[in-house]
Structures are given as structure tokens and as C-alpha cells.
A protein has these predicted regions:
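Glycine-centered low-complexity coil/loop motifs and glycine-rich tracts
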Residues: 114-121, 138-152, 167-187, 201-226, ...
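N-terminal secretory signal peptides that target proteins for export/translocation
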Residues: 1-23
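Beta-strand-rich, repetitive solenoid scaffolds
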Residues: 93-94, 127, 392, 402, ...
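Residue-level detector of buried hydrophobic side-chain packing
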Residues: 92, 127, 156, 188-190, ...
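Extracellular beta-helix/beta-solenoid repeat scaffolds
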Residues: 43-207, 229, 235-239, 352-354, ...
């Protein structure tokens, strides 16, 4: 009947609203509120006191006793409530069809119950309220000593606000009686339609038990119970308030290795502002192995989170420093409308015991700007963060300050992380900036373990700031941008790892590389603007990759780089560097692959500094090298090009399997110390130059088919003396190499191979005094004057050509191993071989002979060729020689006259 009447009333009010549509807005609002009140007032208030129960009754539904109001202002006697709670689950309900009140539930007296049942399931104390719920006194709902039996779960569903002014305790009970499995604590779950307020004297406890039983393996601490608060309004934890779900302590016994209890998770989720001035803790219990801290999650979906109390999910302590401390639990703070952290956030490991891993800290901030007024939405971390990883979420600005002690990574997934104080991020923390995020240095310096990601680094405050990256010695890649902002940003790469930077940086401060690590740049502006330059300390390296062209950035180099890879190294690609480079003694520069072109007018400058070049790629030095008395050594397998007139007086050395190309007459510096080429090393000349007075020590046949000393392009002159320190090769791949020294080749017993291609030649203008064999492999050996080759040097024709150029020459034994040729010049001259050596049934062609062809026995009239001093060649050997008549044209067989002449 009552419900029918209510329906009639509501329908009447709706019709009335329609008739009064022309009324003012205040009248309409009043009508709406009246309608809403009539629809929601189907509740009665219930108060828990010491007075006898009235206006309410008990009923049993399944295994749950339900107290329901039968009239408004119902009263529930606390003793009645306790008796029911002691044996079964209980629910208090305010809903009543005929009720005219909002349905509040108020606890004016304390409730204390010890579960007196061996039920294996937790009892549930449910409060279903249409209005607010007030805990004005304490409530203790705990399990008895029965083994492994859970206690009470408190479930509150309130249509209005919840206020906690006493102690709500559902913690585990003592294990003094020695049960091997621990009684579990209860849990607390609240869904609040209004605000949640925990007064200064208010506490919610769901702690695990402290185990006091010392003989059995059940001596470990109890786990903490869960606490969950879902609030449609705001949350206010006042100074002195406590939420505690910590794990219990294990018994300190030597008989068993006990474990501290794991902390229970605590979750606070509000829609409006969350003001935290109390204590929220879920610390792991102590034991020979500390317990893990519980997870703490605090959020506001539409407003701020302002924390200024105690927040700890620290792991438990170990009883003994030789055992493992507990891991910290994760902590998450999320304020859609802003986040302020005024006190420490502790997700660290236990203070005693072997170090393990702290919990992760997630900070989600919605501040549009960072303020400094100390308001609830200032976006600042004023306390210290202790734990493992810290993650910045949310699109807002979050300021971090203080000497934070978390040990894991720092991740900015969204928004801006603002550095309030110098070194606020732990030095070993790996920093990762997601796309479109910002690290704002705030006018102070910061050191991080590493930097990865693609966000931006800047400073919104004036002054010089230093960003130091690399102390965790890892390898990371960063594609974001580093800029000055309003300050001047300096960047320092420390540690032994590799930091790859590929963004378009614009910062104007100095770049430093130290600590044995590598700064690898894949952008032409990877080092910022060119104004302040870059310094590479001994043991560290600067790398280039990706086809970049660095501007006129001054560069200072020391040492040979990390693991001898070079203080400056081309990693890959065709790259260029236009800055002047200052070097200390012993600096190494390598081109690992690809090519590196150094294009400054003055490339290398050092005070009596020697340099090392290496790698398998190409290093092109286009400007002047000024090293004082320093030397240059190329020991790589690639090529080094010296293209300018250089200023140094030390030895130039080519070893390994590499090539040193000289493109300027003065590229090898002064001629006081000379050049040394050994092994498979190569010295190349290009461009039609004349290298004056430079001595060359040569051993080996080079790394190709044209010798260890070779002409590459143009007609080039070497006026110094070549000394053979081993059997060696020289040649010309194109053009002519003229040896004009006095002597051209110094005396030795080693042999010389001559290489070349068709149309190229090596010219002996000066004397060749070596007595070892002269082997003509390919190309042409030209005589530049009479008697250039030592008489004792035998000649092996192995595919090459000997051109007299009209000069007389006397040499040792003639051997024939491959089809070869002799070219005679014009004018009267002779080429004399002392005797005949090995003939390998190959053809030796003599070009340019002048005489009567077709008349056997007719001596030559200009150039003549002799083998021995009598007719020593057999018919078989003579048949391996031919005269080529270019005017015939025809090829003629060879005869030998009695004086040894071949005709």
C-alpha cells in the first residue's frame, strides 16, 4: 500500500512539473529536489548504542543474520550485534520501503568480537546504508586462535559519506597457542557515495599476526589483509589517521628460518580531491627472511591527490644481516587534476638484510602547470621516493626534488618531469622519456644512469645546467631532442656503456665523453650547436654513423678510445666532420666501416703529439695535420687519405693490411724521419705530386696486386731513397711513378717485384743498388738513365715489361716464367743479361728492335739484347723468344750470334 501511494505521489509531481513549465528556474529546481527526495527516502537511520534494540528486527538469510529497520531512527544494541557477529556473518540494512530518512548508520559505541567458530570461511560484516556511515567508536573484529581460520571481512556500501573516528581492527589474532598455520586477518572494502574522512584518531587495521610460537615451521608472520575504498566524492585522511595492512613478524628462532608476513594491498580511489595527511602503510613483516610489502594504490579520477603524511610499502627486515630483506611493494599515485607529494614515498627494501628489490612507484599527474605556492595542486614531489622503479604518468607536470633513494628506473610515460633540485633523480637510475614527454632541468644539474626514448630535454630556467648520462654502464639509444630552453645545457657521457644519440639537438653547451664509454651520434646535430665543442677523455670514444655531416664543432681528443676502438671512430656510413680537432699524444682515430671525411682547414693539431689511425673503412683527412715532432701510424686494414700539406717531423708508419694514400706533396710532413711500410701495408701516391727528399723503408708486397708502394693516379715523383728491409713490391695502377732519389733504391740483398697495369709504369731515374732479384710481374719498368739496376740483380720475367727507353743496362741472369716483353728505345744502346736461367716454356717478346728482318744473322742497328757473351741459348730456348716488327707487322724467330746478341 505504501509503495502504491508513493507511485501516485511521484506521478502527480511529474504532472505538476509539466503544468508549471512556465515558472522560473528556482521553482523548477525546488520541484526537482522534492521529487528526488521522495524517490530516495526509502530508508531509515540506524544507530548502534548501549540502549536496547528498537525499530528493527533480525532475520536469517542463508548463513547471514540481517538487521533491518522496521521504523525510522532504529536503534541496534551493541551486545545483540556482538552476539550475532560471534557466530555468523551479519548485515545491517537501512533500506525500508516506508522509510523517510536517508539511511545513515552510526556507531556510537565500540564493538569488540573475537570469532568463536571453527568455520573455514571468513565471516562478513556488511553495512548497507542509503546515507552516511559513521564509526565514532572503535571496532575490533578478530579471529580466535583456531588454526588457519580467517577472521572478518568488513564490507561497507554507503550512499553518502563515511567517517571513521575510531579504530576499525580486523587484524589477525595471536598464534601463541602454537598452530602451524596462521589465522588470517580480515579485509575492509568500502564503496562510498559521498566523501571518505578518516579523523585524526581514526584507524583501519588489517595487519597480519606477529607469530609468537617458536617450535614449528609455522613460526612465520601472518599476511596482511586487503583494504579497498572506492569513493564517489573526496578522500580526507587527517593528521594522525592510520590505514595499516602490514605483514606480521615471524618468531625469532634459530630452529626454523621464518619469513615475515606479506603486506596486504591498500587501494584508495576517489573522484574528487584526495588529501592524505595521515599514515598509509603495508610494510612486510620481519623474519629471518623479510616479508614483501603490500601494494598501495591512491587515485583521483577527476581532481588532485595531495599527499603529506606517511606512505610506506617497505619490505620487512631480516633478523640477521646474512638473510634476505623483504622486497618493497608497488606504490601508485594518480591525480587527474594534479599531484602533490610533500612527504617521503617509501617502497624500499627492508632496512636490515641482504639487498633485494624495492617496489615500483607510479606517479600520474594532471597538472597543466607547475606552481610554487604550496597548494594542493602544485605538482611537486617534496618528499623522498624510496623503492625500485618510478614511473611518471599523466599529461601534467610533476616536479621531483630531494635526494631520492629509489634504485630502479625512472620512466616518463606522459607529460613533463620537472627537476626541482639538483640530483633529484638517483645517479644510477635509467631514465626513459616516451614520445612527446619532457624532462625539464629547471635550472639545475642532473645525473642519470642512462637516457633512452624519444622525449625532449630542456630547461625552463636560465643558467647553465649539466646533464650527465651513463653511470649505469649500459647501452641505450635516445632519439629525442636536447635543447637549451631558457638555460645553457651541457651534456656529459660517463660510464663504460654506449649512448646512441640520433635526435636533432640544439643545445649550446659543452659535450663531454669520459669514463671509458662511447657517445655514438647518428644525427648531424647530435652534438648540439657547434659553439662550445666536444671533449673526449682518455679511454672514451665518440662515434659517427648513419650518413651524417657534423658542422664546425671543435673537438678535443685524448687516448685510444674504449678498447682501442679510437677516441674518434666512424662506425658506419658515409660521414663528415668539419670541426678542428685538438689531440694529445697517442690519440687513435679509426674508421671502422664506411668513410669519414675530416674537412676542416686545420684538422688535427697537437703539441709533439703522435697519432694512430686504424679500422677497415676509409678515413679522409682533408685539412692540415700539425703534430710538431709527433708521428703517424696507420695499423688498420682500411685506407687513410692525407690530402693536405702537413706539419710534423715524426715517422710515418703503415703496417697491418692498410693503405696510406698521399694526395699532396707535403702530406707526409717534413722529411726528417721518413716513411716505413711493412707487411701488407701500402703507401699510395695520387694527383701528380712530387714528394721531395722523403725516405721510404719498404718491406712486403702490399695488400693488392700493385705492390706496397704504388702509384694510383697521375704522374708522381718520389725523390727520396727507398730502402728495402725485406723482399718488397712497388708498382703503378695508373700513370707513372718516378723514383728520382740518389740512390732511388738503397743497396740491400733483398729483391723487388714490379707491378702495374697496361699503360702504367715505374721509372727508375735514380740508381737501384739492391742485388736481389728484380721480378717483373705486371706493368712496365722504365729505365730513366744508363745502368740503373745493379749488375748482380737477376731479372725474372713473370708477366711484366722491361723498357730501356734508349738507355744501356747490364743485369744478372734472365729467367722466364710467364709471357713477358722487352721494349727497346731509339738510339744505340744495349740490354745485357749475364746468363740464362730458368725458361718455363713461355714467350718473351722483344719490341722496338731495329735491323734487317728476314736476313738471318744480321746484327741490330740500334738497341741490342744480349744473353751471355756467346751463343749459350739452345734452340729450344731461342724458340721461346720472338722479335715483333711493328711495321710489318710480323713476328720473327730469334737467333743468337756468337757474341751472345739476340737477332
Amino acid at each position: 500500500m505504501t509503495e502504491f501511494k508513493l507511485t501516485i505521489i511521484i506521478d502527480f509531481m511529474r504532472q505538476l512539473l509539466g503544468l508549471l513549465a512556465w515558472l522560473s528556474k528556482p521553482v523548477l529546481g525546488l520541484m526537482f529536489l522534492l521529487c528526488t527526495f521522495l524517490a530516495e527516502a526509502q530508508h531509515s537511520n540506524i544507530r548502534i548504542t548501549n540502549v536496547a534494540t528498537s525499530n528493527g528486527s533480525w532475520s536469517l538469510s542463508g548463513s547471514t543474520y540481517i538487521f533491518t529497520a522496521t521504523g525510522d531512527n532504529a536503534n541496534l544494541n551493541v551486545t545483540d550485534l556482538q552476539n550475532y557477529l560471534r557466530t555468523n556473518s551479519v548485515e545491517i540494512k537501512t533500506s525500508r520501503a516506508a522509510g523517510t530518512q536517508v539511511g545513515s548508520v552510526v556507531f556510537d559505541v565500540g564493538v569488540s568480537v573475537t570469532k568463536n567458530s571453527s568455520s573455514g570461511s571468513a565471516f562478513v560484516f556488511t553495512i548497507s546504508s542509503g546515507g552516511e556511515v559513521q564509526f565514532n567508536a572503535s571496532m575490533s573484529l578478530r579471529n580466535s586462535v583456531y588454526t588457519n581460520y580467517p577472521g572478518y571481512n568488513v564490507v561497507v556500501t554507503a550512499g553518502g559519506s563515511v567517517r571513521i573516528g575510531g579504530v576499525l581492527d580486523v587484524s589477525g589474532y595471536s598464534n601463541a597457542d602454537g598452530y602451524t598455520s596462521l589465522p588470517s586477518p580480515g579485509s575492509v572494502s568500502m564503496v562510498v557515495g559521498g566523501d571518505l574522512t578518516v579523523l585524526g584518531a581514526g584507524q583501519v587495521l588489517s595487519r597480519g599476526i606477529n607469530n609468537t610460537y617458536q617450535y614449528l615451521s609455522g613460526s612465520s608472520g601472518g599476511v596482511g589483509g586487503l583494504q579497498s575504498y572506492v569513493v564517489s566524492g573526496g578522500i580526507d585522511l587527517q593528521v594522525g589517521s592510520v590505514l595499516n595492512a602490514g605483514g606480521g613478524n615471524g618468531f625469532a628462532t634459530q630452529s626454523y628460518v621464518t619469513t615475515g608476513g606479506v603486506g596486504g594491498a591498500i587501494s584508495l580511489s576517489g573522484v574528487n580531491g584526495v588529501l592524505l595527511r595521515g599514515s598509509i602503510q603495508s610494510v612486510g613483516g620481519s623474519g629471518y627472511q623479510g616479508g614483501v610489502g603490500g601494494a598501495l594504490t591512491i587515485s583521483s579520477s577527476a581532481s588532485y591527490v595531495d599527499y603529506g603524511g606517511v606512505l610506506s610499502s617497505q619490505g620487512g627486515n631480516a633478523f640477521n644481516a646474512n638473510y634476505q630483506a623483504g622486497n618493497g611493494g608497488n606504490i601508485s599515485l594518480s591525480g587527474f587534476g594534479g599531484l602533490s607529494i610533500r612527504s617521503d614515498v617509501n617502497a624500499g627494501v627492508g632496512a636490515i638484510g641482504l639487498s633485494v628489490t624495492g617496489g615500483n612507484i607510479s606517479l600520474s599527474d594532471g597538472n597543466g602547470v607547475l606552481t610554487t605556492g604550496g597548494g594542493v595542486n602544485d605538482g611537486q614531489v617534496g618528499g623522498l621516493l624510496r623503492g625500485n622503479n618510478v614511473t611518471k604518468l599523466g599529461v601534467g607536470v610533476l616536479g621531483i626534488g630531494g635526494a631520492n633513494a629509489y634504485t630502479g628506473t625512472t620512466t616518463v610515460s606522459a607529460g613533463k618531469l620537472y627537476v626541482l633540485q639538483a640530483e633529484s633523480i638517483p645517479n644510477l637510475s635509467a631514465l626513459s622519456l616516451s614520445a612527446s614527454t619532457i624532462l625539464d632541468m629547471g635550472g639545475v644539474s642532473e645525473s642519470v644512469g642512462s637516457l633512452a626514448g624519444s622525449g625532449k630535454v630542456t630547461s625552463s630556467v636560465s643558467g647553465e645546467v649539466l646533464l650527465t648520462v651513463g653511470s649505469d654502464n649500459t647501452t641505450t639509444s635516445y632519439s629525442g631532442m636536447m635543447e637549451d630552453g631558457l638555460g645553457v645545457l651541457r651534456v656529459s657521457k660517463s660510464g663504460t656503456g654506449t649512448w646512441s644519440v640520433s635526435g636533432a639537438n640544439t643545445y649550446s653547451g659543452l659535450t663531454q665523453v669520459s669514463g671509458g664509454g662511447v657517445l655514438s651520434i647518428g644525427s648531424s646535430s647530435g652534438l648540439g650547436s657547434v659553439s662550445a665543442g666536444t671533449e673526449v677523455s682518455s679511454g672514451a670514444s665518440l662515434e659517427l654513423y648513419g650518413g651524417i655531416s657534423v658542422g664546425a664543432e671543435p673537438l678535443s681528443l685524448l687516448g685510444i678510445g674504449r678498447s682501442s676502438i679510437g677516441a674518434l671512430r666512424n662506425l658506419s656510413g658515409v660521414n663528415a666532420y668539419a670541426g678542428a680537432i685538438t689531440v694529445g699524444s697517442g690519440v687513435r682515430v679509426n674508421s671502422n666501416a664506411g668513410s669519414l671525411s675530416l674537412t676542416a682547414a686545420s684538422v688535427f693539431t697537437g703539441s709533439n703529439a703522435s697519432m694512430l689511425f686504424g679500422g677497415a673503412g676509409i678515413l679522409s683527412v682533408g685539412g692540415v695535420v700539425s703534430l710538431g715532432s709527433g708521428a703517424i701510424t696507420h695499423d688498420g686494414t682500411g685506407s687513410v687519405y692525407l690530402l693536405a700539406d702537413n706539419v710534423y717531423s715524426g715517422l710515418t708508419r703503415v703496417s697491418g693490411n692498410g693503405t696510406l694514400r698521399v694526395g699532396s706533396s707535403g702530406a707526409l710532413g717534413s722529411n726528417s724521419s721518413g716513411v716505413e711500410v711493412i707487411g701488407s701495408g701500402v703507401l699510395e701516391l695520387v694527383g701528380g705530386i712530387s714528394v721531395l727528399g722523403e725516405s721510404l723503408s719498404l718491406a712486403g708486397y702490399g695488400n693488392g696486386v700493385v705492390g706496397g708502394f704504388r702509384n694510383v693516379s697521375g704522374n708522381n715523383v718520389w725523390s727520396g731513397t727507398v730502402s728495402l728491409t725485406g723482399n718488397a713490391g712497388l708498382g703503378s695502377g695508373s700513370g707513372k711513378l718516378s723514383l728520382t732519389g740518389s740512390p732511388a733504391i738503397a743497396a740491400s740483398s733483398f729483391g723487388l717485384r714490379i707491378y702495374g697495369v697496361v699503360g702504367s709504369s715505374v721509372e727508375l731515374v735514380g740508381e737501384a743498388l739492391y742485388t736481389g732479384q728484380t721480378e717483373l710481374v705486371s706493368g712496365s719498368l722504365l729505365l730513366g738513365a744508363d745502368e740503373r739496376i745493379a749488375n748482380a740483380s737477376s731479372v725474372m720475367f713473370n708477366g711484366g715489361n722491361l723498357s730501356t727507353s734508349g738507355y744501356t743496362e747490364t743485369v744478372g741472369e734472365l729467367s722466364l716464367y710467364a709471357a713477358s716483353s722487352i721494349s727497346l728505345g731509339s738510339g744505340v744502346h744495349s740490354l745485357r743479361f749475364s746468363s740464362a736461367g730458368v725458361y718455363d716454356f713461355k714467350l718473351l717478346t722483344i719490341n722496338g728492335w731495329q735491323g734487317v728482318y728476314g736476313t738471318p744473322g744480321s746484327s741490330g742497328t740500334a738497341g741490342k739484347v744480349y744473353v751471355g757473351t756467346s751463343a749459350v741459348l739452345t734452340r729450344e730456348r731461342l724458340d721461346q723468344m720472338r722479335f715483333y716488327n711493328a711495321t710489318g707487322p710480323a713476328t720473327h724467330y730469334c737467333l743468337q750470334l756468337s757474341d751472345g746478341e739476340l737477332v
